[in-house]
From Swiss-Prot:
Classification of source organism: Bacteria, Bacillati, Bacillota, Bacilli, Lactobacillales
EC number: 2.7.7.3
Protein species of origin: Latilactobacillus sakei subsp. sakei (strain 23K)
Protein name: Phosphopantetheine adenylyltransferase
Parts of the chain that traverse the membrane: none
Entry superkingdom: Bacteria
Localisation: Cytoplasm
Protein backbone atom coordinates (compact mmCIF):
# COMPACT_ATOMS: atom_id res chain seq x y z
CA UNK A 1 0.00 0.00 0.00
CA UNK A 2 1.29 3.45 -0.91
CA UNK A 3 2.14 5.72 1.99
CA UNK A 4 -0.38 8.54 2.30
CA UNK A 5 1.67 11.73 2.70
CA UNK A 6 -0.03 15.06 3.38
CA UNK A 7 1.48 18.52 3.26
CA UNK A 8 0.22 21.26 5.57
CA UNK A 9 1.63 24.48 4.10
CA UNK A 10 1.39 27.90 5.71
CA UNK A 11 3.28 30.90 6.96
CA UNK A 12 2.50 29.96 10.60
CA UNK A 13 3.45 33.38 11.94
CA UNK A 14 2.76 32.42 14.66
CA UNK A 15 1.65 28.79 14.93
CA UNK A 16 -1.71 28.82 16.74
CA UNK A 17 -3.80 26.31 18.66
CA UNK A 18 -5.99 26.15 15.55
CA UNK A 19 -2.98 25.07 13.49
CA UNK A 20 -2.07 22.51 16.13
CA UNK A 21 -5.57 21.06 16.16
CA UNK A 22 -5.53 20.76 12.37
CA UNK A 23 -2.16 18.97 12.46
CA UNK A 24 -3.26 16.60 15.22
CA UNK A 25 -6.38 15.65 13.29
CA UNK A 26 -4.47 15.27 10.01
CA UNK A 27 -1.92 13.03 11.75
CA UNK A 28 -4.74 10.56 12.45
CA UNK A 29 -5.87 10.57 8.81
CA UNK A 30 -2.52 10.23 7.03
CA UNK A 31 0.59 8.08 7.36
CA UNK A 32 2.81 11.15 7.35
CA UNK A 33 2.15 14.87 7.64
CA UNK A 34 4.75 17.43 6.64
CA UNK A 35 4.27 20.95 7.94
CA UNK A 36 5.85 23.29 5.40
CA UNK A 37 6.72 26.76 6.65
CA UNK A 38 6.29 28.67 3.40
CA UNK A 39 7.17 32.21 2.38
CA UNK A 40 4.18 34.42 1.69
CA UNK A 41 5.40 37.40 -0.33
CA UNK A 42 2.33 39.40 0.73
CA UNK A 43 3.12 39.13 4.45
CA UNK A 44 5.82 40.66 6.63
CA UNK A 45 6.79 37.92 9.09
CA UNK A 46 7.39 38.44 12.80
CA UNK A 47 9.49 35.26 13.09
CA UNK A 48 12.04 33.99 10.58
CA UNK A 49 11.75 30.52 9.04
CA UNK A 50 14.21 28.69 11.32
CA UNK A 51 12.54 30.15 14.43
CA UNK A 52 9.10 29.08 13.23
CA UNK A 53 10.38 25.57 12.47
CA UNK A 54 11.98 25.28 15.93
CA UNK A 55 8.80 26.47 17.68
CA UNK A 56 6.58 24.11 15.71
CA UNK A 57 8.95 21.18 16.34
CA UNK A 58 8.65 21.86 20.07
CA UNK A 59 4.86 21.98 19.89
CA UNK A 60 4.44 18.79 17.82
CA UNK A 61 7.16 16.74 19.54
CA UNK A 62 4.68 14.03 20.57
CA UNK A 63 3.31 13.51 17.03
CA UNK A 64 5.54 10.75 15.64
CA UNK A 65 4.29 10.95 12.05
CA UNK A 66 4.59 14.74 11.72
CA UNK A 67 7.67 16.68 10.62
CA UNK A 68 8.42 20.34 9.90
CA UNK A 69 10.46 21.93 7.14
CA UNK A 70 11.13 25.49 6.04
CA UNK A 71 10.50 25.83 2.33
CA UNK A 72 10.86 29.44 1.26
CA UNK A 73 10.06 30.73 -2.21
CA UNK A 74 8.54 27.79 -4.03
CA UNK A 75 5.09 26.87 -5.27
CA UNK A 76 3.22 24.63 -2.87
CA UNK A 77 2.34 22.18 -5.66
CA UNK A 78 6.00 21.87 -6.65
CA UNK A 79 7.08 21.25 -3.09
CA UNK A 80 4.32 18.66 -2.61
CA UNK A 81 5.65 16.79 -5.66
CA UNK A 82 9.22 17.01 -4.35
CA UNK A 83 8.30 15.36 -1.02
CA UNK A 84 5.84 12.85 -2.50
CA UNK A 85 2.74 14.42 -0.93
CA UNK A 86 -0.52 13.71 -2.75
CA UNK A 87 -2.67 15.69 -0.31
CA UNK A 88 -2.72 19.27 0.92
CA UNK A 89 -4.26 19.92 4.33
CA UNK A 90 -6.10 23.17 4.90
CA UNK A 91 -8.02 24.33 7.95
CA UNK A 92 -11.30 26.13 7.33
CA UNK A 93 -12.66 28.55 9.94
CA UNK A 94 -15.47 30.18 7.99
CA UNK A 95 -17.05 30.79 4.58
CA UNK A 96 -14.33 33.26 3.61
CA UNK A 97 -11.65 30.61 4.21
CA UNK A 98 -13.65 28.15 2.12
CA UNK A 99 -13.92 30.54 -0.83
CA UNK A 100 -10.20 31.31 -0.70
CA UNK A 101 -9.12 27.68 -0.31
CA UNK A 102 -11.44 26.51 -3.09
CA UNK A 103 -9.75 28.93 -5.48
CA UNK A 104 -6.25 27.97 -4.32
CA UNK A 105 -7.12 24.27 -4.70
CA UNK A 106 -8.22 24.91 -8.29
CA UNK A 107 -4.98 26.77 -9.01
CA UNK A 108 -2.94 23.96 -7.46
CA UNK A 109 -4.75 21.51 -9.75
CA UNK A 110 -3.44 23.46 -12.76
CA UNK A 111 0.08 22.72 -11.50
CA UNK A 112 -0.53 19.10 -10.44
CA UNK A 113 -3.81 17.41 -11.36
CA UNK A 114 -3.13 14.58 -8.88
CA UNK A 115 -2.83 16.89 -5.85
CA UNK A 116 -5.93 16.72 -3.66
CA UNK A 117 -6.83 19.41 -1.14
CA UNK A 118 -8.40 18.11 2.07
CA UNK A 119 -10.34 20.69 4.06
CA UNK A 120 -10.68 20.22 7.81
CA UNK A 121 -13.31 22.36 9.50
CA UNK A 122 -12.02 24.22 12.53
CA UNK A 123 -13.47 23.25 15.86
CA UNK A 124 -15.67 25.97 17.32
CA UNK A 125 -13.13 26.93 19.98
CA UNK A 126 -10.52 27.68 17.30
CA UNK A 127 -12.72 29.15 14.57
CA UNK A 128 -11.97 32.77 15.49
CA UNK A 129 -8.18 32.46 15.82
CA UNK A 130 -5.93 33.94 13.15
CA UNK A 131 -2.19 34.49 13.28
CA UNK A 132 -2.68 38.14 12.33
CA UNK A 133 -5.04 38.75 15.24
CA UNK A 134 -2.73 36.90 17.64
CA UNK A 135 0.15 39.19 16.64
CA UNK A 136 -2.00 42.27 17.11
CA UNK A 137 -3.21 41.18 20.55
CA UNK A 138 0.34 40.31 21.62
CA UNK A 139 1.74 43.60 20.27
CA UNK A 140 -0.59 45.53 22.57
CA UNK A 141 0.22 43.40 25.61
CA UNK A 142 -2.90 41.25 25.51
CA UNK A 143 -3.11 37.65 26.67
CA UNK A 144 -2.49 35.05 23.97
CA UNK A 145 -2.22 31.94 26.16
CA UNK A 146 -5.61 30.64 25.01
CA UNK A 147 -4.75 31.23 21.35
CA UNK A 148 -1.27 29.72 20.92
CA UNK A 149 0.68 26.82 22.44
CA UNK A 150 2.79 27.75 25.52
CA UNK A 151 6.16 27.75 23.69
CA UNK A 152 4.76 30.12 21.09
CA UNK A 153 3.30 32.44 23.74
CA UNK A 154 6.72 32.73 25.40
CA UNK A 155 8.45 33.36 22.06
CA UNK A 156 5.90 36.05 21.17
CA UNK A 157 6.41 37.83 24.47
CA UNK A 158 10.20 37.70 24.09
CA UNK A 159 10.16 38.83 20.47
CA UNK A 160 7.86 41.76 21.13
CA UNK A 161 9.71 42.77 24.29
CA UNK A 162 13.02 42.91 22.42
CA UNK A 163 11.38 44.54 19.41
CA UNK A 164 10.27 47.48 21.53
CA UNK A 165 13.70 48.08 23.07
Amino acid sequence: MTERIALFPGSFDPFTKGHLDTVERASRLFDRVIIAVMTNAAKKPLFDGPTKVALIETVIADLDNVSVVAQPKTLTANFAQAVGARYLIRGIRNANDFEYERDIAALNQTQDAQLETVLLLAKQEFSFISSSMVKEIAAFGGQVDQLVPPAVAVALQEKLKHGRD
